[in-house]
UniProtKB/Swiss-Prot annotation:
Cell compartments where the protein resides: Plastid, Chloroplast thylakoid membrane
Alphabetical UniProt keywords: ATP synthesis, ATP-binding, CF(1), Chloroplast, Hydrogen ion transport, Ion transport, Membrane, Nucleotide-binding, Plastid, Thylakoid, Translocase, Transport
Organism: Jasminum nudiflorum (Winter jasmine)
Purpose of the protein: Produces ATP from ADP in the presence of a proton gradient across the membrane. The alpha chain is a regulatory subunit.
Protein name (record): ATP synthase subunit alpha, chloroplastic
Site (Required for activity): 363
Length: 504
């Protein structure tokens, strides 16, 4: 018979008792009452925070948005097809955040900052909250440095500064994305990090933008955040905030950033869908009451930091799509009131072959000439006024049979000025080339040419100036002013090229 050794048993028990760690883990849990259409109703989750992440039994993550007396309304970050009624849900105690690092440059991500370009995982040691507060008044300074878009019409008449928020607004298929991608391409060598956020777009459109950026060598300083049209509404709603968090990471590291939201109409629609399914009361155009706050808290994150924070900047170019030119709809008026100006793209101008189809008359930059180099201010001062007068005259001239000489010459000048603002896609111009273009038009050098020859002449003049008068570009780049020496060089180049052009 085996003898029982009491001392051994007591020692073992004593060791076990000493090792016992009375750690109680309290988990805030709930039960799924109902699920469908990307929304789940949860019973329980008594101490959940608004905006807290919750995890379902089968792994789907959701955000608690509606905290009601009897249940919690959760929006899902996935399709939720495997979630069953009665399954358990636990609160994570975390708010949505994403990893951030330099390694994200050149990559295509989704709204959760996970790569979707098939090039492997991205290593990151830091993380940022998707929704973080905008910089306060003290930490900002006024916009004073230009952000060149490479488009003559914008840089000369609707200048954008670093830290500004400039809305690009227009109907579908008017070239809004083209203006944005051209601006990204023009940041090459300017030490600006770009973030392009595609919200609810076709996958083919996003692929086209990525290809354009790769061909232009712009992907090395660009991050693309994309949530396609078939993505859950929650992710389409989150994508712009993810883009803003990535841009902020670089801004607070004393760098300049440019972020494009393409487009905020789709984000508002995704948010409307979520709100209606959560049974929040609808307001104007069935949007929820806080749709203004949806966009204002996003766009207020764009800023120009003061010197104590390192003078970094985040420039935002939100895009909004209008329905048949109706700028007075709910979302367009909201975003116009939040931003520092708008670039209005017109379908009529686009169809008339004027591209970029910018309606200069109703486009405006509220930062104004503070965001222009001195050289551009010197040359482009009269351009907007002359074009506005021309548009008015042109409308009047349709009814007049015989016009006096002065009116005819003003109309002829206006047509040529409109012609010089035309620019092909993915062909941004340097500041020097823009100054040359505007000067040639406003000083009347193009008046003797046929309208069809204007762009040919300007192309030839750019080449001539680059090869024979390189000092011109050097003066503009180094001094940022249109000096007398630069003007003499430009006049010589124009006359030489004009003689050569007329002989052809």
């Amino acid at each position: 018979m085996v003898s029982i050794r009491a001392d051994e048993i007591s020692n073992t028990l004593r060791e076990r008792i000493e090792q016992y760690n009375r750690e109680v883990k309290i988990v805030n849990t709930g039960t799924v009452l109902q699920v469908g259409d990307g929304i789940a109703r949860i019973h329980g989750l008594d101490e959940v925070m608004a905006g807290e992440l919750v995890e379902f039994e089968e792994g789907t993550i959701g955000i608690a948005l509606n905290l009601e007396s009897t249940n919690v309304g959760v929006v899902l970050m996935g399709d939720g097809l495997m979630i069953e009624e009665g399954s358990s849900v636990k609160a994570t105690g975390r708010i949505a955040q994403i990893p951030v690092s330099e390694a994200y440059l050149g990559r295509v991500l989704n709204a959760l900052a996970k790569p979707i370009d098939g090039r492997g995982e991205i290593s990151a040691s830091e993380s940022r909250l998707i929704e973080s507060p905008a910089p306060g008044i003290i930490s900002r300074r006024s916009v004073y440095e230009p952000l060149q878009t490479g488009l003559v019409a914008i840089d000369s008449m609707i200048p954008i500064g670093r830290g500004q928020r400039e809305l690009i607004i227009g109907d579908r298929q008017t070239g809004k994305t083209a203006v944005a991608t051209d601006t990204i391409l023009n940041q090459q060598g300017q030490n600006v990090i770009c973030v392009y956020v595609a919200i609810g777009q076709k996958a083919s459109s996003v692929a086209q933008v990525v290809t354009t950026l790769q061909e232009g060598g712009a992907m090395e300083y660009t991050i693309v955040v994309a949530e396609m049209a078939d993505s859950p509404a929650t992710l389409q709603y989150l994508a712009p905030y993810t883009g803003a968090a990535l841009a902020e990471y670089f801004m607070y590291r004393k760098q300049h950033t440019l972020i494009i939201y393409d487009d905020l109409s789709k984000q508002a629609q995704a948010y409307r869908q979520m709100s209606l399914l959560l049974r929040r009361p609808p307001g104007r155009e069935a949007y929820p009451g806080d749709v203004f706050y949806l966009h204002s808290r996003l766009l207020e994150r764009a800023a120009k930091s003061n010197s104590s924070l390192g003078e970094g900047s985040m420039t935002a170019l939100p895009i909004v799509e209008t329905q048949s030119g109706d700028v007075s709809a709910y979302i367009p008026t909201n975003v116009i009131s939040i931003t520092d100006g708008q670039i209005f793209l017109s379908a009529d101008l686009f169809n008339a072959g004027i591209r970029p189809a910018i309606n200069v008359g109703i486009s405006v930059s509220r930062v104004g000439s503070a965001a222009q180099t001195k050289a551009m201010k010197q040359v482009a001062g009269k351009l907007k006024l002359e074009l506005a007068q021309f548009t008015e005259l042109e409308a009047f001239a349709q009814f007049a049979s015989d016009l006096d000489k002065a009116t005819q010459s003003q109309l002829a000048r206006g047509r040529r000025l409109r012609e010089l603002l035309k620019q092909s896609q993915s062909a941004p111009l340097t500041v020097g080339e823009q100054i040359m273009t505007v000067y040639t038009g406003t000083k009347g050098y193009l008046d003797s040419l046929e309208i069809g020859q204007v762009s040919k002449f300007l192309d030839a003049l750019r080449t001539h100036l680059k090869t024979n008068k390189p000092q011109f570009q050097e003066i503009i780049s180094s001094t940022k002013t249109f000096t007398e020496e630069a003007e003499v060089l430009l006049k010589e180049a124009i006359q030489e090229q004009m003689e050569r052009f007329l002989l052809q």
